A protein has these predicted regions:
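Generic marker of residues within folded, mature protein domains
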Residues: 4, 50-52, 85
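A generic structural signal for well-ordered coil/turn residues at beta-strand boundaries
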Residues: 8-12, 58, 89
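A structural signal for short, well-ordered beta-strand segments
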Residues: 12-16, 60-62, 93-97
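A short linear hydrophobic-aromatic micro-motif
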Residues: 44-50, 92-94
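C-terminal structural segments of small proteins and small subunits
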Residues: 67-102
Length: 102
């Protein structure tokens, strides 16, 4: 039986700091915009995964899928550049690419 190509999944997790923000409502508003842009521009699935109760911090994790390793790396590079260009401060970033063959 012929084996199907598994494809690659990229995972990027980023710490965000909103020094000018003064409320959870303000943070949520900014995060909604950022998440929508990441989804639209890079086809990424995005979730806030930590610091829900803090109004100046957030951790976003996104994932993207492609049939090629290079394509996944390019998508994550683009997402990281997008995040770095925003008004908030970008902290620690973790990245990984996995495949079902791993």
């Amino acid at each position: 039986m012929r084996r199907m190509g598994a494809g690659f999944v990229g995972i990027l997790s980023a710490e965000l700091h909103f020094p000018e923000n003064g409320s959870l409502k303000g943070k949520r508003k900014e995060l909604l915009s950022v998440k929508a842009q990441l989804q639209r521009r890079f086809g990424a699935s995005v979730a806030e995964v930590d610091h829900h109760e803090l109004w100046q911090r957030a951790r976003l994790t996104l994932s993207c899928v492609s049939r090629g390793y290079r394509e996944v790396e390019e998508l994550m590079d683009g997402a990281e550049r997008y995040l770095a260009g925003q008004a908030f401060e970008l902290g620690r970033i973790e990245r990984n690419v996995v495949t079902l063959d791993d």
